[in-house]
């Protein structure tokens, strides 16, 4: 995982300003929620988390916590959150069993001015995670996922926690075989640890 | 050039005169015109009746989606059943508008509605005694306009400075929907209005009695006027046909 300070600021800045209600899909350490609350103290945050222990932790920073699994809740669950100003997934979308279905259900209840922000691990990152998530995508796969869920990606940010190690860069150079544009494409694909994706309903 | 660009005429109730055949009638609320589009048939009952506070904008949001689905290009025109922006106005100029009897509509040729098909035709900008905000407050409730423009800033539709300058300025284009403009302008402007209206409804909408309940429509009109004026300025003020609106009424002169 990248350093919290490195991704929290751009993530927070992509979230809708001064939200009445934000929905956080999956519990985290609360760093992002606290950073957002510092800017917008009157905003409400609801966390949806299936794991009882993680849900209990989330109560430390969230106004409300639903212990529920987004993969299996009914359409009525999503409908009751139709008044949320935005949803965000902090490296949790790739942990859903059916991420496309979850996105689709959120997208169906979202008002037109709201958005989904997701920080998603890059499958092509040079360093494979110790515990791979349920799903792994490269950028093209992420864009396909959102488009297939009725959502339009309106912005994206590469999260680069640091430069490539020398040996990784040397390997990519070899792979590129002297082709500079291919080398640039390989570096661009493998350097980001995550992508920050902002999407809105396709309506 | 397409000889008959898409042209929509919006009405919320039946009326006693006939609009030109090239226009697509659009019925807002529960009004179902004999031909054309009826919001009550295209949308859910709740959505169609949201014209209570959104006015004609419910129909405009839907038309925008249709234009995108049709991959429409070029220009698109809009009028209300009794309000038009014409290249050659009819009737008698009274204050900021022309007043004309509905029978005079028979004298209006299609090209008076859409000109050469590639030049924007828009209502004139009207200057008021006070600021835009004061003029709004004099008619309804200033708080609504302030909140609406705050939401427009939060949605990224306008900047703080643009909002401050517009609300403290003394002029805007009334009935900015009534225009013949590039499809792209319409799609972009209506998209922005829908974002702001959606956020405003969730965050700041307050029910008001009677006519004043159309607060979101009134606020949309001001923001639309600003967004249209911005595009006119970029296009070139001298390359746009700006005319006083023509209003029809049974008691108006029949020349």
Question: At which residue positions do the language-model features occur?
Answer:
Chain B
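ER/Golgi luminal nucleotide-sugar-dependent glycosyltransferases, focusing on the catalytic module
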Residues: 1-255
């Amino acid at each position: 995982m990248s350093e919290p300070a490195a991704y929290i600021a751009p993530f927070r800045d992509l979230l809708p300003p001064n939200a009445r209600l934000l929905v956080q899909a999956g519990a985290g350490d609360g760093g992002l929620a606290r950073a957002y609350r510092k800017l917008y103290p009157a905003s409400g945050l609801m966390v949806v988390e299936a794991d009882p222990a993680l849900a209990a932790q989330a109560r430390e920073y969230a106004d409300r916590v639903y212990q529920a699994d987004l993969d299996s809740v009914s359409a009525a669950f999503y409908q009751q959150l139709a008044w949320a100003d935005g949803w965000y997934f902090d490296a949790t979308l790739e942990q859903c069993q059916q991420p496309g279905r979850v996105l689709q259900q959120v997208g169906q209840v979202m008002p037109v001015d709201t958005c989904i922000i997701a920080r998603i691990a890059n499958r092509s990152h040079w360093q494979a995670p110790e515990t791979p998530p349920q799903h792994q995508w490269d950028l093209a796969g992420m864009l396909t996922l959102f488009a297939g869920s009725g959502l339009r990606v309106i912005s994206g940010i590469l999260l680069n926690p640091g430069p490539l190690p020398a040996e990784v860069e040397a390997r990519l150079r070899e792979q590129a075989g002297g082709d500079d544009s291919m080398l640039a494409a390989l570096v661009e694909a493998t350097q980001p640890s995550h992508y920050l994706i902002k999407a809105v309903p396709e309506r | 050039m397409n000889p008959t660009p898409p042209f929509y005429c919006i009405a919320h109730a039946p009326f006693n005169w006939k609009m030109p055949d090239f226009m697509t009638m659009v019925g807002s609320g529960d009004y179902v015109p004999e031909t054309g589009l009826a919001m009550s048939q295209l949308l859910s009952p709740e959505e169609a009746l949201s014209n209570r506070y959104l006015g004609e904008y419910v129909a405009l949001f839907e038309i925008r989606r249709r234009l995108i689905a049709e991959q429409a290009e070029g220009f698109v025109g809009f009028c209300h059943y009794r309000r038009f922006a014409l290249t050659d106005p009819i009737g008698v100029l009274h204050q900021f508008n022309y007043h004309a009897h509905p029978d005079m509509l028979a004298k209006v040729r299609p090209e008076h509605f859409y000109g050469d098909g590639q030049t924007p035709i828009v209502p004139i900008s009207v200057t008021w005694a006070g600021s835009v905000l004061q003029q709004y407050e004099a008619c309804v409730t200033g708080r609504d306009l302030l909140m609406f423009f705050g939401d427009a800033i939060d949605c990224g539709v306008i900047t703080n400075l643009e909002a401050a300058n517009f609300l403290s300025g003394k002029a805007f284009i009334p009935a900015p929907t009534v225009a013949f403009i590039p499809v792209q302008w319409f799609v972009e402007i209506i998209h922005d209005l829908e974002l702001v209206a959606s956020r405003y409804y969730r965050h700041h909408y307050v029910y008001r009695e009677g006519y004043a309940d159309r607060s979101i429509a009134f606020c949309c009109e001001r923001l639309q006027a600003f967004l249209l004026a911005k595009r006119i300025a970029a296009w070139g003020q001298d390359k746009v046909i700006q005319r006083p609106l023509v209003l029809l009424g049974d008691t108006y002169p029949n020349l």
